[in-house]
Regions:
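Helix-loop-helix "hinge/cap" segment bordering the ligand-binding cleft or interdomain interface
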Residues: 81, 140, 144, 157-223, ...
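C-terminal lobe and pocket-closing loops
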Residues: 126-128, 293-304, 316-419
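Short, well-ordered beta-strand elements
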Residues: 54-65, 86-91, 116-117, 164, ...
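Short, solvent-exposed loop/beta-turn-alpha elements that line the ligand-binding surface or hinge
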Residues: 137-149, 192-193, 234-252, 259-260, ...
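Short, low-complexity disordered leader/linker segments with a strong preference
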Residues: 1-59, 81, 436-439, 443-451
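Extracytoplasmic ligand-binding clamshell segments of periplasmic binding protein
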Residues: 96-100, 233-306, 310-315, 342, ...
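Hinge/lid segment of periplasmic solute-binding proteins
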Residues: 45-49, 119-174, 201-203, 209, ...
Length: 451
């Protein structure tokens, strides 16, 4: 895929020099006068420099040099245009090490080891903000217009109405489908847009008859069930209590998943490499996943022009159901140890909270799709992508993100997902009763919470 930068960040390199006095040594009675003059110059120089370079340095923890670290380096350059003394000390750490350091600091009651800014997985915010609130600086007064981000993404880092994260990468759910396989069945890509799951299944059967491959591939049933749940805006936690039993959307999602498997419409792989291979080798006609899966799809260069992106199907007969969900991603947080919150707020506001040019650069050079909604209006985001038949896929994905409902997992996302994985496995492999398995899942989560 050809990549074209349509906007360039112009970074002005500014340096400050200090006069150190290189003239000849003053003689006799002129020495005191010269010393006084030199002291005066130093005082004036200090007065002209309101803050040292060190005072304008922020420390950042994040992972992945080609993605998150790159994003911070580009944000630093962008901010330096108007703030030449500004610097970032970016420390690359794997996420597990970041979370361990955060929890260790919180349990010791000593936050002095924390950086000014850190990146956190979205699904970790509720858990950490609930259990270790002292880690964070609240962002409600940081100046960022949070309405310009996806509501579904914001919900992950908003706890009890308080914002703790600034959304970064986009995890909007997409349905990527093989346009050539769809056309072989006498259908069009447009037929798969804005469908219900029952409509999707009928279309899929036609594609399967024409191609002899499953319509979808997946890896781990709980993920797609959770995406279905979010697409209906149905929270698994309500008012701090587990809400799996009598959750109509959840039951419908599990029923839908079972039907997809039973009718051979979707193949479920436990091995991740086999899952990716099913896309790259053409043994499945599509996939529903967070938009980050696109890099894996695009690894099969021989399939360029044979893929398209549409939104996911919505649950039938569920009030509030939509065609949109989110899967994965991370957001920037400011720690309670931040030495200069005004500077951190201004930096984040001016870059990740407003800079469309920055988001253009990150898309082209790092493959980072914005969750900042105005980014979809740029020329870069509206440019057709040859791999997807000339479709302006990035604009579409940001627009998808703008429709994602927010739901509440509380501090127990991992517990809920684990319990649902067991429930779904029993329903599909043992034909277990769905209501019973949902009740067992709720009991399991409640037991874990009570411990």
């Amino acid at each position: 895929m050809k990549k074209k930068v349509l906007s360039v960040l112009l970074v002005a390199a500014m340096a400050m020099s200090m006069l150190t006095g290189c003239g000849s040594k003053p003689a006799g009675n002129d020495a005191q006068s010269a010393a006084s003059s030199e002291a005066s110059k130093e005082t004036e120089a200090a007065a002209e420099t309101p803050a040292s370079a060190e005072d304008e340095t922020l420390t950042v923890w994040c992972w992945d040099p080609n993605f998150n670290v790159y994003a911070m380096k580009q944000a630093e350059k962008a901010y330096q245009v108007d703030h030449p003394n500004f610097k970032l000390d970016i420390q690359e750490k794997v996420y597990s090490d970041i979370e361990t350091a955060l929890i260790t600091a919180a349990e010791a009651g000593d936050y002095s080891t924390l950086p000014d800014i850190f990146l956190m997985q979205d699904y970790s915010f509720h858990k950490n903000a609930t259990n270790y609130p002292g880690i964070f600086t609240a962002l409600d007064d940081c100046g960022i217009d949070f309405s310009q981000f996806s509501m579904g993404k914001l919900a992950d880092s908003t706890v009890d109405g308080t914002h703790y994260g600034i959304p970064f990468d986009n995890g909007a759910t997409i349905m990527a489908i093989r346009s050539d396989m769809v056309e072989a069945a006498g259908l069009k890509v447009e037929d798969f847009k804005d469908t219900t799951w029952s409509e999707f299944m009928e279309l899929s059967k036609k594609v399967m008859a024409a191609t002899d491959v499953p319509m979808l591939t997946c890896s781990g049933g709980s993920e797609i069930v959770i995406e279905m749940l979010q697409s209906a805006g149905a929270s698994p936690m309500v008012d701090g209590k587990v809400s799996l039993v009598d959750n109509k959307a959840l039951k419908k999602a599990i029923e839908t998943y079972k039907q997809l498997i039973d009718e051979g419409i979707m193949a479920d792989y436990t091995d991740w490499d086999q899952y990716i291979a099913s896309m790259n080798k053409g043994t499945a006609a599509g996939v529903i996943q967070g938009c980050w899966i696109m890099s894996s799809i695009q690894a099969a260069e021989d399939q360029a022009g044979k893929w398209a992106i549409v939104n996911m199907p919505k649950l039938d007969d569920v009030e509030g159901a939509t065609n949109y969900a989110n899967c994965g991603g991370a957001s920037w947080a400011v720690s309670s140890n931040c030495k200069n919150t005004d500077l951190a707020f201004d930096f984040l506001n001016a870059t990740f909270g407003a800079d469309v040019d920055l988001y253009d650069d990150l898309l082209v050079n790092a493959g980072a799709i914005a969750s900042y909604l105005p980014a979809a209006q740029s020329e870069t985001y509206n440019e057709g992508n040859e791999f997807y038949g000339g479709q302006a896929v990035y604009k579409d994905i940001v627009e998808f993100a703008g429709h994602v409902p927010g739901i509440d997992y509380g501090a127990y996302y991992s517990d809920i997902r684990s319990a649902l994985t067991d429930a779904i496995t029993n329903v599909v492999q043992k034909n277990a009763d769905i209501d019973t398995e949902i009740k067992n899942a709720q009991d399991t989560v409640e037991f874990n919470i009570a411990e």
